[in-house]
Structure formats: structure tokens, C-alpha cells
């Protein structure tokens, strides 16, 4: 069983050792790591094959296997993400504001590291590297606890990172992997208040809920994507068709994929047959439709109440027909996971109202929700997509992994 106390102590010590690292040293190391990832592709693929074989043995679906799979191209993309982080401006030490107060004290507010970040995540091995690169660039140490399905891949990736750190003269404890997949050890990490400054869970609804219930350390909630697309009365239906097909079928296993379709009744009778025909040519979808939508499909099943709350991560989509923009907004706000939502419309006023009133981290007009991604937003590899409002919201890049500190300089000042 993993000794979490010892691991936490090492992480805390490492956070102090890497806190003074300069931008130049950090960027040089990240560039070295990006190259090492590509150079070590075959070793990483061999480790990943063990995870894939185990997953197949346990009957994991093809869609979930895709989340787990590494390929040469995906490793190259991970390396590019690391290099992009190296190329980004360093927020550490950035002066947010500076002034002299009425007492003559010189006050600066600067960005500083959080300290030790813990990350609990599922399936995707790329998260190990993405999370490390962002944590390292912001002078934070990181503890990674991945799912048991990606254990071999995560071990190989973290081993490579630690070797690269050591070869560069930097403490390898800047990154540590919890290899014990037990729930007991995960809960220990959630409660490690002496060592962990913030915990970021990244995974399905069950994981997020467990962390919310059991964590004693501060948590930034991420991930679950019950994402909707609303097709308005004034929508371009050709555009809507293309966007829904992209958002639902391109990669259904990711959190920015659409799960719910909301349609204005004025266009439902035209749009549903049009969409069904077009999507069947790409990838058939199981429609779970409400009473108004059901008779408009050639093939659909009646929706149950829980279907409107579910992140399917599959070729399944709930469908709701509404009578107004106001009803669409109300419905979405009732069922959203506060991740990403979209409206398809040519009505500028409706678009503005939707963006202002829908309670989500990213709200789109006439675009696929699949764009909610730190890399796409220019933040580099993201550590997660926050669905809460405090500290960080939406794709979390470098600034989300910093805090601020006030630096006050005086000359014998005392307060009367």
C-alpha cells in the first residue's frame, strides 16, 4: 500500500525546491521533455498495450478504449502540448498591480505557485503529462493518481518525466504517481491537508461526487459534461445539422461532446427528419426523445427522466422540444453540468440572451461545443475544465494554477 504521508512529505519538499526555478530553466526542461516523449514512443506504446489488453479482457467498450489508447500521433500531440506550454508566457512573478498607499508603503500583488497540486483522474494517460507540464511551468509539485485501467501507461509516462527531471538536475519528486489504485488510498489523498494545497478531480460524475463528499483539501470541480445544443426558431438548419453531428459523433467519449438536443417547436418537424437522415450516414445515434419529439423520428425511444441528467459518453442523445427561447434556457439551466452549452440561431438578440442567461463555463453561438479545450483556447495543455465559479472556471491553463501574494516594502513603518 502506498505510504501517502511519505509521498506527501516528498511533494511538499519538492514544491519548495522548484519554487525558485527561473522561466529559462523551466522552459528548457519542458522542451527536453517534449523531445524525450517522442524519442521514447515505442516504450510508451508497449506500456499502453498492456493497459489495452487488460481493458479488452474486462469488456471495456470501444469508445472507452479510445480514451485509453495511445498512438504515435497522440504521443506527438502530447509532446506538442508540452512544447506549447514551454512557449507560453510565465505567469509566476507577474505583477498584477503595484502602488504606494497613503502610509508610503510600496505594495505589489504578484502571482505565485499554489504549492502541491493533487490530481485524481480516469482513463486518459495524456492527463499525466498535461497536468505535470502545467504544474511545473507554474512551479508547483504534483501528485498524480490515475485510474487502474491506465496504470501501465501512467507508470511509463511518470518514469520518463522523473528520469528527465533527474538528468536535468531537478528534483524528480516534482511529480509523483500513486500506483495503488485502491479507493482507500485515494481517500487518503483527498484528506491530506498537511501536504496538498488543492485537489483537482477529472473524470465521470461518480468520481466527482465522491471527491466532493470525502475531500478535506480544497477542490476545484471539473469535468462532467451534460452538454446541450439548442436549435432556435431562427436557426440555419443546415448549419445546425453539421454542428450537432460534429458535437455528438466526432468523439462521444469526451466531456465537451453534446449529450442533449433542445429544439424549438417551430423547426422541430423540419429539423428532426433532416438531422436523423444526415447523422445516419455518418454514425447512427440512439435518440431518447420526449413526447413531442418522439413521433418526428423514424427510430427513437421514449426518454426517461434520468436520460436528461446523463452524460452518456456514447452515441446516445436526449431530445427535448420547447415552445420558446425562455423555456430552452430554463430547461438547460435545470439540467446542465455547467460545462458547455450552445445555441444555433440567426437571431442576434436571442444569441445574446442565451449567452447571458445560460449558467455554464463556455456558451457558444453557432459553433460546436467540441471547442471547449485548453489547447484550442490557446492555454496550452489544460489540467481540466472547471465547472465551478470560485478560483477558476472553464479550461484551466497556467493562471488557474497560481495564487497571489502581497509584497509590502516599508522603511521602519509602524501603524499608529
Curated annotation (Swiss-Prot):
The keyword Kinase does not apply. Its EC number is 1.2.1.41. It is found in: Cytoplasm. InterPro entries: Ald_DH/histidinol_DH, Ald_DH_C, Ald_DH_N, Aldehyde_DH_dom, G-glutamylP_reductase_CS, Glu-5-SA_DH, GPR_dom. GO terms for cellular component: cytoplasm. Catalyzes the NADPH-dependent reduction of L-glutamate 5-phosphate into L-glutamate 5-semialdehyde and phosphate. The product spontaneously undergoes cyclization to form 1-pyrroline-5-carboxylate. The gene is proA. One of its GO terms (biological process) is L-proline biosynthetic process. Keywords: Amino-acid biosynthesis, Cytoplasm, NADP, Oxidoreductase, Proline biosynthesis. This is Gamma-glutamyl phosphate reductase. It catalyses: L-glutamate 5-semialdehyde + phosphate + NADP(+) = L-glutamyl 5-phosphate + NADPH + H(+). PANTHER family: DELTA-1-PYRROLINE-5-CARBOXYLATE SYNTHASE, GLUTAMATE SEMIALDEHYDE DEHYDROGENASE. NCBIfam families: PRK00197.1, proA. GO terms for molecular function: glutamate-5-semialdehyde dehydrogenase activity; NADP binding. Belongs to the gamma-glutamyl phosphate reductase family.
Amino acid at each position: 500500500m502506498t505510504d501517502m504521508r511519505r509521498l506527501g512529505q516528498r511533494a511538499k519538499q519538492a514544491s519548495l525546491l522548484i519554487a525558485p526555478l527561473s522561466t529559462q530553466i523551466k522552459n528548457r526542461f519542458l522542451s527536453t521533455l517534449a523531445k524525450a516523449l517522442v524519442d521514447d514512443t515505442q516504450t510508451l506504446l508497449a506500456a499502453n498495450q498492456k493497459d489495452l489488453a487488460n481493458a479488452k479482457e474486462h469488456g471495456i467498450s470501444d469508445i472507452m478504449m479510445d480514451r485509453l489508447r495511445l498512438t504515435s500521433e497522440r504521443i506527438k500531440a502530447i509532446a506538442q502540448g508540452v512544447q506549447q506550454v514551454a512557449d507560453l508566457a510565465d505567469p509566476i512573478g507577474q505583477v498584477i498591480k503595484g502602488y504606494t498607499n497613503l502610509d508610503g508603503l510600496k505594495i505589489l500583488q504578484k502571482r505565485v505557485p499554489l504549492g502541491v497540486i493533487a490530481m485524481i483522474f480516469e482513463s486518459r494517460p495524456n492527463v499525466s503529462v498535461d497536468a505535470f507540464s502545467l504544474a511545473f511551468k507554474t512551479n508547483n509539485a504534483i501528485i498524480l493518481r490515475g485510474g487502474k485501467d491506465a496504470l501501465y501507461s501512467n507508470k511509463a509516462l511518470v518514469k520518463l518525466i522523473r528520469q528527465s527531471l533527474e538528468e536535468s538536475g531537478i528534483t524528480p519528486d516534482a511529480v509523483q504517481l500513486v500506483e495503488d489504485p485502491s479507493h482507500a488510498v485515494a481517500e487518503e489523498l483527498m484528506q491530506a491537508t498537511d501536504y496538498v494545497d488543492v485537489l483537482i478531480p477529472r473524470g465521470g460524475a461518480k468520481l466527482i461526487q465522491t471527491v466532493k463528499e470525502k475531500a478535506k483539501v480544497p477542490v476545484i470541480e471539473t469535468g462532467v459534461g451534460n452538454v446541450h445544443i439548442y436549435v432556435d426558431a431562427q436557426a440555419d438548419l443546415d448549419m445546425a445539422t453539421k454542428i450537432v453531428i460534429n458535437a455528438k459523433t466526432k468523439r462521444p467519449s469526451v466531456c465537451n461532446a453534446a449529450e442533449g438536443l433542445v429544439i424549438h417547436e417551430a423547426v422541430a418537424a423540419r429539423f428532426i427528419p433532416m438531422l436523423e437522415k444526415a447523422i445516419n450516414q455518418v454514425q447512427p445515434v440512439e435518440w431518447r426523445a420526449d413526447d413531442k419529439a418522439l413521433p418526428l423520428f423514424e427510430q427513437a425511444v421514449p426518454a426517461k427522466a434520468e436520460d436528461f441528467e446523463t452524460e452518456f459518453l456514447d452515441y446516445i442523445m436526449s431530445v427535448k422540444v420547447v415552445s420558446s427561447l425562455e423555456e430552452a434556457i430554463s430547461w438547460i439551466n435545470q439540467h446542465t453540468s455547467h460545462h458547455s452549452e450552445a445555441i444555433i440561431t440567426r437571431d442576434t438578440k436571442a444569441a445574446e440572451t442565451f449567452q447571458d442567461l445560460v449558467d455554464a463555463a463556455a456558451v457558444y453561438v453557432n459553433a460546436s461545443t467540441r471547442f471547449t479545450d485548453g489547447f484550442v483556447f490557446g492555454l496550452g495543455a489544460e489540467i481540466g475544465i472547471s465547472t465551478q465559479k470560485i478560483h477558476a472556471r472553464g479550461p484551466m491553463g497556467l493562471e488557474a494554477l497560481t495564487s497571489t501574494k502581497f509584497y509590502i516594502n516599508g522603511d521602519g513603518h509602524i501603524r499608529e
